[in-house]
Amino acid sequence: MTLADPALPRPRLILASASPRRFDLLSGAGLSPDAVEPTHIDEHEIPGELPGPLALRLAQEKAMAHPGSDDAFILAADTVVGVGRRILPKTETEAEARRCLDLLSGRNHRVFTGIAARGPDNRFAARVVETRVKFKRLSQPEIDAYIASGEWRGKAGGYAIQGRAGCFVINLIGSFTGVVGLPLYETANLLTGLGYPVTARMGEGGSA
C-alpha cells in the first residue's frame, strides 16, 4: 500500500516557513499546510557564494533543521534576489530598500527560490528555480511612494511582485509564484516525487 491509498490516513504537510505568502500559495493550490513550524538557521551567505546556490542551501538547511515526523512531509523554501553575482538583502530598513530599488531600476535581475522537502521515510529532494525579471526605470517619486507603502519590509530585494511593485515589472521569464516565494509547479512535482498525494489534495479543494 502507498501513502496515496485511500485506506490510509492522509499524511500531514508541514510548512517550515513563517512566510504568509507561501502559506497562501499552497492553500490556493489546494495544498493547505496542516501546520506551520518555521525553523531557524543562520541565513548569512558564505563568502563568494552565488545567489542560486545560496537559495538552495538555505532551503535544504531549513528542511533538515525540522525534527521531522513519521506522518508528515516537511516543506521549506528560501528566496534570494541577485543582480549578477551580487546578492540583495531581505530589506529591513528604508535605506536598504531604497538602495535595492535604485539598483533594480531599469535593469534585469534574477530571483532564485530554493525548495526542499523531506518525507516521513526521510527521503529528501531539493531544487532551485530561477526567474528573470526586468523593472522599468523608476522615477524618484515612484521610489518614494513605494518606500512610504512599507511593502518592502522583509522582502528579498526590497519588493513584493504580488503587490504594488507589480506595476514596475516590464517582463518576467520563469515562475511568477517563484518570485512571490514558492514556485508551485516545481513544488508540486517535488512533493509528488516523494510520495505526497498532491493530486488527491487538489481534489479535496484544500480541505484537511
Swiss-Prot record:
GO terms for biological process: nucleotide metabolic process. Its EC number is 3.6.1.9. It is found in: Cytoplasm. Keywords: Cytoplasm, Hydrolase, Nucleotide metabolism. Its cofactor is a divalent metal cation. The keyword Hydrolase applies. The active site is at residue 78. It is an enzyme of class 3 (hydrolase). The keyword Hydrolase applies. It catalyses: dTTP + H2O = dTMP + diphosphate + H(+); UTP + H2O = UMP + diphosphate + H(+). SUPFAM superfamilies: ITPase-like. One of its GO terms (cellular component) is cytoplasm. GO terms for molecular function: dTTP diphosphatase activity; UTP diphosphatase activity. The record marks 21, 79, 162 as: Important for substrate specificity. Pfam families: Maf (PF02545). HAMAP family: Maf. Belongs to the Maf family. YhdE subfamily. Nucleoside triphosphate pyrophosphatase that hydrolyzes dTTP and UTP. May have a dual role in cell division arrest and in preventing the incorporation of modified nucleotides into cellular nucleic acids. This is dTTP/UTP pyrophosphatase. It comes from Maricaulis maris (strain MCS10) (Caulobacter maris). The lineage of its organism: Bacteria, Pseudomonadati, Pseudomonadota, Alphaproteobacteria, Maricaulales.
